[in-house]
C-alpha cells in the first residue's frame, strides 16, 4: 500500500504544508484505491471533484504554508444520506436509486468549503436503518477486519458501515456519517476507528435525509481522536435552515486535547453491566478504568435506572418518526414509481417495491404506535420514559464529568450470519441511551479480541462538552494505542 494512505489527517496536513507531497499526489493515491476497493464501501465515485479540490489546495500551499484549513486537500467520503448537489443521493434505497438533489446539505457543503477532496458517496443501511450495513439496496459492506478463528468476513456495523469501513481500509482519511441510535459509534467500534456523535443540535440536519428527526445527528469517523476533532470543528455550527441547530459558539475542539484529566470524575453505570456482554469487553472496560485512575481521574459507580427501557423506547419513537418522515415517498413527486391503474394502487405498489424489508417493518411498527387506538399507550408513553432517561443523565452529571461504557456488547459478527431483528436491536443497547438524551458521545478503540477483531469503549459527556470527551478519548487512545489492520 502507498504509505500516503496510512497517514492521519493531521499527518497529511503537515506533509502538504511542508511540501513533502502534493495534494494531487495524495488524492490520486486514494482515487486509485477507491477504484479497486473490494469492500463495497463507495457506491458513487467523484474523482473529478476530488482532483479539482486537490489542485486548488496545491495552489494555496504554494502561496502560503500557515493558516490553511486542516482539511484542505484531504481525501474524505460522505455517507449517502447527505444530499449532494448534482450528485446521486440514494439513502441506499431503491426508492431513491436515481435521485439527484438540486441542493447541498449544510454539513457536506462545509466540508467542500473547507477544501476537502470528496472522493464519493458511501454505502449505508437503507435510510440509515440497521446495525450491520446488510440492509443496503446496493449490497452489504465488508469489514476490512477478518475473524482469525475461521477466516470469516465480518460486518462493519451500521448504519454508517461504508463510512467506517472506508476509513479503516485506508480508502479515505475521514468520513461523514450520521448517528440516530449509534450509527457512527457502533460501526467505528466494529472497524477499529474513532467515531463521534456531537450533541443533538451541534450540526445542521438540513439536507440530511430524515430517518428519526428528534434523534438524527451528523457525526464523523476518522483514524485518530485528533482527526475527529479537526473534522468536527468544520461541520458544527448554527444553521438558520435547521430550527433545531444550536446557536452556541463552536470551540476549537483540537485545542482542548492536552491529555490532562486530573480530578475528572468518571461514572461507571451499574445498569450497563448486563447479560450478553463479552468477557473480553468487560476486561478492557476494567483495564481502561484503571488506566484513567493512574492518569489522575476518579472512577465512581453511578446508576442510570431507566436505561433498561432504552431499547423499546428508542424503537417506538424512531419507528413512529420513520412512519411520518417516509410518508412523502409515494411515487408522485420524485423517486421510484410503479405504474398502476389507480392512484391508491400506485401508492401501494410503489412503497411495497421501493422500500426494503427492514424499512417496511419499521414503518408498520411506527404506524401502529401512532394510530388513534394506540398513540397514548405506546408513543406518548415512550416519550415520557425518554424524559426519564434524559433526567437520569442530567442527575448523574451533577456529580460526574463523563461516563465510560462499551460501544457494543460484542465484537463484530459474521457477514453471513443472520441474527434475528431482536438481536440486532439489542446490539444498540450501549449507544441508544445517549441518543435518546441528545448527549455527545465518542467511540474509541481499546484493543483486539482473541479472534483478532476490534473492541471499543465509549465516552459520554454532558451537553455541548465535545471538547471534554475528545480529550478523555485521547487519553484512552494514548494508553491503548491505535489499532491498524495489517491486511490492508
Curated annotation (Swiss-Prot):
It is an enzyme of class 6 (ligase). PROSITE patterns: AMIDASES. Its EC number is 6.3.5.7. Keywords: ATP-binding, Ligase, Nucleotide-binding, Protein biosynthesis. Pfam families: Amidase. InterPro entries: Amidase, Amidase_CS, Amidase_dom, AS_sf, GatA. One of its GO terms (biological process) is translation. The active site is at residues 79, 159, 183. It comes from the Bacteria. It catalyses: L-glutamyl-tRNA(Gln) + L-glutamine + ATP + H2O = L-glutaminyl-tRNA(Gln) + L-glutamate + ADP + phosphate + H(+). GO terms for molecular function: ATP binding; glutaminyl-tRNA synthase (glutamine-hydrolyzing) activity. GO terms for cellular component: glutamyl-tRNA(Gln) amidotransferase complex. The keyword Ribonucleoprotein does not apply. Belongs to the amidase family. GatA subfamily. Heterotrimer of A, B and C subunits. Allows the formation of correctly charged Gln-tRNA(Gln) through the transamidation of misacylated Glu-tRNA(Gln) in organisms which lack glutaminyl-tRNA synthetase. The reaction takes place in the presence of glutamine and ATP through an activated gamma-phospho-Glu-tRNA(Gln). This is Glutamyl-tRNA(Gln) amidotransferase subunit A. It comes from Wolbachia pipientis subsp. Culex pipiens (strain wPip).
Amino acid at each position: 500500500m502507498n504509505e500516503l494512505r496510512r497517514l492521519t489527517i493531521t499527518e497529511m496536513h503537515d506533509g502538504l504544508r511542508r511540501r513533502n507531497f502534493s495534494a494531487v499526489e495524495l488524492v490520486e493515491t486514494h482515487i486509485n484505491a477507491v477504484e479497486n476497493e473490494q469492500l463495497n464501501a463507495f457506491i458513487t465515485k467523484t474523482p473529478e471533484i476530488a482532483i479539482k479540490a486537490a489542485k486548488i489546495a496545491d495552489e494555496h500551499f504554494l502561496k502560503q504554508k500557515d493558516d490553511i484549513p486542516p482539511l484542505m486537500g484531504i481525501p474524505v467520503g460522505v455517507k449517502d444520506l447527505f444530499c449532494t448537489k448534482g450528485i446521486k443521493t440514494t439513502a441506499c434505497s431503491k426508492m431513491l436509486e436515481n435521485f439527484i438533489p438540486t441542493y447541498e446539505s449544510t454539513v457536506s457543503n462545509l466540508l467542500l468549503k473547507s477544501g476537502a477532496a470528496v472522493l464519493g458517496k458511501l454505502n449505508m443501511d437503507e435510510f440509515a436503518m440497521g446495525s450491520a450495513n446488510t440492509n443496503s439496496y446496493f449490497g452489504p459492506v465488508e469489514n476490512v477486519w477478518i475473524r482469525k478463528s475461521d477466516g470469516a468476513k465480518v460486518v462493519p456495523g451500521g448504519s454508517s458501515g461504508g463510512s467506517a469501513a472506508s476509513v479503516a481500509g485506508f480508502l479515505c482519511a475521514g468520513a461523514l456519517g450520521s448517528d440516530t441510535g449509534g450509527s457512527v459509534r457502533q460501526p467505528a467500534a466494529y472497524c477499529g476507528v474513532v467515531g463521534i456523535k456531537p450533541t443533538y443540535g451541534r450540526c445542521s440536519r438540513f439536507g440530511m435525509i430524515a430517518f428519526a428527526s428528534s434523534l438524527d445527528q451528523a457525526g464523523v469517523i476518522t483514524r485518530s481522536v485528533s482527526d475527529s476533532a479537526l473534522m468536527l470543528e468544520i461541520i458544527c455550527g448554527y444553521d438558520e435552515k435547521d430550527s433545531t441547530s444550536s446557536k452556541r459558539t463552536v470551540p476549537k475542539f483540537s485545542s482542548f486535547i492536552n491529555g490532562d484529566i486530573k480530578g475528572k470524575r468518571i461514572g461507571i453505570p451499574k445498569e450497563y453491566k448486563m447479560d450478553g456482554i463479552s468477557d473480553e469487553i468487560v476486561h478492557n472496560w476494567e483495564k481502561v478504568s484503571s488506566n484513567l485512575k493512574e492518569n489522575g481521574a476518579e472512577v465512581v459507580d453511578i446508576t442510570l435506572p431507566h436505561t433498561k427501557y432504552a431499547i423499546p423506547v428508542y424503537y417506538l419513537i424512531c419507528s413512529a418518526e420513520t412512519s411520518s418522515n417516509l410518508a412523502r415517498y409515494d411515487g408522485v413527486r420524485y423517486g421510484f414509481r410503479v405504474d398502476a391503474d389507480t392512484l391508491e394502487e400506485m401508492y401501494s405498489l410503489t412503497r411495497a417495491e421501493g422500500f426494503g424489508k427492514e424499512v417496511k417493518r419499521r414503518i408498520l411498527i411506527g404506524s401502529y404506535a401512532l394510530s388513534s387506538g394506540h398513540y397514548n399507550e405506546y408513543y406518548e408513553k415512550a416519550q415520557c420514559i425518554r424524559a426519564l432517561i434524559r433526567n437520569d443523565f442530567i442527575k448523574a452529571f451533577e456529580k460526574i464529568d463523563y461516563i465510560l461504557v462499551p460501544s457494543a456488547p460484542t465484537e463484530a459478527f459474521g457477514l453471513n450470519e443472520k441474527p434475528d431483528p431482536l438481536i440486532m436491536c439489542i446490539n444498540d443497547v450501549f449507544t441508544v441511551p445517549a441518543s435518546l438524551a441528545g448527549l455527545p458521545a465518542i467511540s474509541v478503540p481499546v484493543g483486539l479480541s482473541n479472534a483478532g477483531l476490534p473492541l471499543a469503549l465509549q465516552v459520554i459527556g454532558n451537553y455541548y462538552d465535545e471538547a471534554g470527551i475528545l480529550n478523555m478519548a485521547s487519553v484512552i487512545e494514548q494508553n491503548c494505542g491505535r489499532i491498524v489492520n495489517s491486511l490492508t
